[in-house]
C-alpha cells in the first residue's frame, strides 16, 4: 500500500457493480420469462451471476476492512451514513405500497363492490399463520439485540448462539410465508386486493431473505474472528437492516392482515 496522508479509503476499480447490475437485469428478465413462458433458464443464469457477484464483492470488502485496515473511523462514519440513507430509501419504497393499499381500501370503488375486502375475496385469518409470523420476527428482533450486546461485551459464544437463533427464525419465517402463499385462497391476479397483498408482503419476504443472507455472512465472519467489540460495522449494518424488516412487518400485519381483513 502506498503511503497516504488522509484517513479515507481510495477504492480500487471494481467490476462487481457492473456484474451486479447485469445480474439484476437477468433476474428481472428471467422472472418475466418464468411468469409468462414458464422458462427458468434466464432466471437461473441471473441468480448464479448474482451469487457469484455477492461472494466476490463481499470477499473484497472483507479483505479491505479486516485484513488491510482501510475501514478507519472516518470511513466507518461514511458507511454508517450510507446505511442510514439506504434504510430511509427502503422506508419510502414500502410507503408506496402502503399508499396503494390505503388508497384502494379506504374508499373502495363500485368495481370492488363498494366494500373491503372486495366482493368474492376471502382474506387470511390474522390470528393464524400471520400472528405466528409476527411472534417469530419479534423473537428474532430480541435475539439480534442479544447478539449485538454480546459482541460489544466480547462474549463470542453467546454472540454466535444468538446470531444462529436469529438466522433460524428468519428462515422459519420465510418457510411459513411460503406455505401461506401456497395455501392462500386468492392470487396476485385477483384484482387490487391480490396485487397489493402479494406485492407488499412479497417484497417484505424478499427483504427477510436478503437480511438473513447478511446475517449468515456475519455468522461465518464471526466464526473466523473478524469482529471485535469496537470494530464490527458489517454486523451492525445487518442488525439495523433486520430491525427495519421487523418494523415493516408490524405495519404490514396491522394494516393488511388485521385491519384489511
UniProtKB/Swiss-Prot annotation:
The keyword Transmembrane applies. It comes from the Eukaryota. GO terms for cellular component: mitochondrial inner membrane; respiratory chain complex IV. Its EC number is 7.1.1.9. The chain crosses the membrane at residues 16-34, 41-66, 73-105, 129-152, 156-183, 191-223, 233-256. One of its GO terms (biological process) is mitochondrial electron transport, cytochrome c to oxygen. It is found in: Mitochondrion inner membrane. GO terms for molecular function: cytochrome-c oxidase activity. It catalyses: 4 Fe(II)-[cytochrome c] + O2 + 8 H(+)(in) = 4 Fe(III)-[cytochrome c] + 2 H2O + 4 H(+)(out). Gene3D superfamilies: 1.10.287.70, Cytochrome c oxidase, subunit III, four-helix bundle. It holds the Pfam family COX3. It is a multi-pass membrane protein. InterPro entries: Cyt_c/ubiquinol_Oxase_su3, Cyt_c_oxase_su3_dom, Cyt_c_oxidase-like_su3, Cyt_c_oxidase_su3-like_sf, Cyt_c_oxidase_su3_a-hlx. The keyword Translocase applies. Keywords: Membrane, Mitochondrion, Mitochondrion inner membrane, Translocase, Transmembrane, Transmembrane helix. Residues 1-15, 67-72, 153-155, 224-232 are mitochondrial matrix. Belongs to the cytochrome c oxidase subunit 3 family. Component of the cytochrome c oxidase (complex IV, CIV), a multisubunit enzyme composed of 14 subunits. The complex is composed of a catalytic core of 3 subunits MT-CO1, MT-CO2 and MT-CO3, encoded in the mitochondrial DNA, and 11 supernumerary subunits COX4I, COX5A, COX5B, COX6A, COX6B, COX6C, COX7A, COX7B, COX7C, COX8 and NDUFA4, which are encoded in the nuclear genome. This is Cytochrome c oxidase subunit 3. The lineage of its organism: Eukaryota, Metazoa, Chordata, Craniata, Vertebrata.
Amino acid at each position: 500500500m502506498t503511503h497516504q496522508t488522509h484517513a479515507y479509503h481510495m477504492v480500487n476499480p471494481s467490476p462487481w457493480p457492473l456484474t451486479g447490475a447485469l445480474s439484476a437485469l437477468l433476474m428481472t428478465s428471467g422472472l418475466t420469462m418464468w411468469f409468462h413462458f414458464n422458462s427458468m433458464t434466464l432466471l437461473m443464469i441471473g441468480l448464479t451471476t448474482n451469487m457469484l457477484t455477492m461472494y466476490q464483492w463481499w470477499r473484497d470488502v472483507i479483505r479491505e476492512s479486516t485484513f488491510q485496515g482501510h475501514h478507519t473511523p472516518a470511513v466507518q462514519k461514511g458507511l454508517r451514513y450510507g446505511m442510514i440513507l439506504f434504510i430511509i430509501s427502503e422506508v419510502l419504497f414500502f410507503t408506496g405500497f402502503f399508499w396503494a393499499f390505503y388508497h384502494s381500501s379506504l374508499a373502495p370503488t363500485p368495481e370492488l363492490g363498494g366494500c373491503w375486502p372486495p366482493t368474492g375475496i376471502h382474506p387470511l385469518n390474522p390470528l393464524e399463520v400471520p400472528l405466528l409470523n409476527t411472534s417469530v420476527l419479534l423473537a428474532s428482533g430480541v435475539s439480534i439485540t442479544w447478539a449485538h450486546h454480546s459482541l460489544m461485551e466480547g462474549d463470542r459464544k453467546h454472540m454466535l448462539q444468538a446470531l444462529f437463533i436469529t438466522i433460524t427464525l428468519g428462515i422459519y419465517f420465510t418457510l411459513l410465508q411460503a406455505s401461506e402463499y401456497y395455501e392462500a385462497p386468492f392470487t396476485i391476479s385477483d384484482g387490487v386486493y391480490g396485487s397489493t397483498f402479494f406485492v407488499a408482503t412479497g417484497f417484505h419476504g424478499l427483504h427477510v431473505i436478503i437480511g438473513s443472507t447478511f446475517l449468515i455472512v456475519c455468522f461465518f465472519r464471526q466464526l473466523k474472528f473478524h469482529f471485535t467489540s469496537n470494530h464490527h460495522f458489517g454486523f451492525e449494518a445487518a442488525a439495523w437492516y433486520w430491525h427495519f424488516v421487523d418494523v415493516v412487518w408490524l405495519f404490514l400485519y396491522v394494516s393488511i392482515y388485521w385491519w384489511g381483513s
